[in-house]
From Swiss-Prot:
Its EC number is 6.3.4.3. GO terms for molecular function: ATP binding; formate-tetrahydrofolate ligase activity. This is Formate--tetrahydrofolate ligase. It comes from Streptococcus mutans serotype c (strain ATCC 700610 / UA159). Belongs to the formate--tetrahydrofolate ligase family.
Length: 556
């Protein structure tokens, strides 16, 4: 059986100029990055803004195993299948972060015969967007430290600077650092730290900005820290939003690539869903909606994280609301949520599938609270048995949710046709009545509690002393009308990664609340969620190499 990278490298790629002809593109609408990658020009983005949006489908998942459950694979395969049956379809997904690629994932461009290509480029440096975001973030850090060194006219309290540096790697050694050491000419010594690039507020800003002017306004609104009198200091006080936007002027343009079957795909932006809002850019999704009859997009991790944030944070910024939600389930993840140990997930266990179904059922119920119709996609693995699949089908029928087996990893577009037809039937016969979970005018505590009780099913929310102090500061500064972005483990509905399935009788503890005014939300930190991940004992990087002819090896 071929690996993902072997499949990807066996494909004869089409020139990207040919791929987008079906969308009505001219050569001048693209800024080429070689033969197979391009960015869309601002002129083309502007030209399609008056087009009526097509149908929007969000792909999400149940609580995953550490390897993930194949949301991107299903997203890509479903789009290929829709195109196969004559529906003009585009994809809008996130671009991978190099940290997890070198760490546990080994790649994040789909899998098998449902991939976006060229996968090696997408997984590595792509068009340089991640580096631009990293540079903009760290330029701001340098400008802050220079301001301190040059006399600190704004009266910034260096003990209360909340802006951190970033790097697009998993590097636990950089979580806490001290800068400015050595001598007075090296700046003002202070504690600092590094986050991973995809946790940067600038990543979230890039993914929520609708144009360059909106980008600049959002950058200007970033809070970098506080003065000695505890008043906030914004980027606009430093007057550097223009410089930061200049660094990002190419990165804000959506990237165009293709699937194995030639479906055009926007791959743009990549915030994590456990520490940020977990969705690709508004600009890419909005443009896809105006170019295609169907746009298939995804949100990170399980529906309790990525989908909730898509529906409560991203969707209000789009030209249309979702017409359907596809929840990806795997037999192995159901068994894990049913209590099976990781090393036994490949063994048949019908009873564990039944027990783990409570996790899927809760996600279905949660998505229905938004008024959007739901379809379940079973992402098929070769270890799944007929009895396990049959039980899952029956359980889905019992809660009246359409379900289809998708074998897109093994069979490409053909393996997604049943899912595509069921999705179309669901959309045509069940119009969406989308509504947000909560009103932004509720208090911070009420919004957090609404998410915790309605989505996670917590008994109550406990706000630690630091969080309570921060809420008072948020209210004082008039920031309390923003939506909430929960930072929580992806493995559980709770804030305990070991509490699997559909737990009840637990509390959610909020340890910190961080205003991200540029992004336009408040991050509520729970548990031990890290904004700078570490590498596993045996990182995927150990299996990576490059051949003498430049061919990438070991990505998967």
């Amino acid at each position: 059986m071929k690996t993902d990278i072997e499949i990807a490298q066996s494909v004869d790629l089409r020139p990207i100029t040919n791929v987008v002809k079906k969308l009505g593109f001219d050569f001048d609408d693209l800024e080429l990055y070689g033969k197979y990658k391009a960015k869309l020009t601002f002129d083309k983005i502007k030209a399609v803004e008056e087009n009526a949006p097509g149908k929007l489908v969000l792909v999400t998942a149940i609580n995953p195993t550490p390897a993930g459950e194949g949301k991107s694979t299903i997203t890509i395969g479903l789009a290929d299948a829709l195109n196969k049956i004559g529906k003009k379809t585009m994809i809008a997904i996130r671009e991978p972060s190099l940290g997890p690629v070198m760490g546990i994932k080994g790649g994040a461009a789909g899998g098998g015969y449902a991939q976006v290509l060229p996968m090696e480029d997408i997984n590595l440096h792509f068009t340089g967007d991640m580096h631009a975001i990293t540079t903009a973030n760290n330029a701001l850090s340098a400008l802050i430290d220079n301001h301190l060194h040059q006399g600190n006219e704004l009266g910034i309290d260096q003990r209360r600077i909340i802006w951190k540096r970033v790097v697009d790697l998993n590097d636990r050694a950089l979580r806490h650092v001290t800068v400015g050491l050595g001598s007075p000419i090296n700046g003002i010594p202070r504690e600092d730290g590094f986050d991973i690039t995809v946790a940067s507020e600038i990543m979230a800003i890039l993914c929520l900005a609708t144009n360059v002017e909106d980008l600049k306004e959002r950058l200007a609104n970033i809070v970098i820290g506080y003065r000695f009198d505890r008043s906030p200091v914004y980027v606009r006080d430093l007057e550097v939003q223009g410089a930061l936007a200049l660094i990002l002027k190419e990165a804000i343009k959506p990237n165009l690539v293709q699937t194995i079957y030639g479906t055009p795909a926007f791959v743009h932006g990549g915030p994590f869903a456990n520490i940020a809002h977990g969705c690709n850019s508004v600009l890419a999704t909005s443009t896809a909606l105006r170019l295609a009859d169907y746009t298939i997009t995804e949100a990170g991790f399980g529906a309790d994280l990525g989908a909730e944030k898509f529906l409560d944070i991203k969707a209000p910024n789009l030209p249309t609301s979702p017409d359907a939600v596809v929840i990806v389930a795997t037999i192995r993840a159901l068994k894990m949520n049913g209590g099976v140990a990781k090393d036994a997930l490949n063994q048949e266990n019908v009873e564990a599938v039944k027990a783990g179904f409570a996790n899927l059922a809760r996600h279905v119920e949660n998505m229905r609270k938004y008024g959007v119709p739901v379809v379940v996609a079973i992402n098929e693995f070769i270890t799944d048995t007929n009895d396990e699949i049959a039980v899952l089908r029956n359980l889905c029928a019992a809660i009246d949710v359409p379900v289809e087996l998708a074998s897109v990893w093994a069979n490409g577009a053909d393996g997604g046709v049943d899912l595509a037809n069921t999705l179309i039937n669901t959309i045509e016969n069940n119009p969406s009545h989308y509504k947000r979970l909560y009103d932004n005018n509720l208090s911070v505590e009420e919004k957090v509690t609404e998410i915790a009780k309605e989505i996670y099913r917590a008994d109550k929310v406990i706000f630690e002393k630091k969080a309570k102090t921060q809420i008072a500061q948020i209210v004082k500064n008039g920031w309390d009308n923003l939506p909430i972005c929960m930072a929580k483990t992806q493995y559980s509905f709770s804030d305990d990664p070991k509490l699997l399935g559909a737990p009840t009788g637990f509390d959610i503890t909020i340890r910190e609340l961080v205003p991200k005014l540029g992004a336009g939300f408040i991050v509520a930190l729970t548990g031990d969620v890290m904004t700078m991940p570490g590498l596993p004992k045996k990182p995927a990087a150990l299996n990576m190499d490059v051949a003498a002819d430049g061919t990438a090896l070991g990505l998967f």
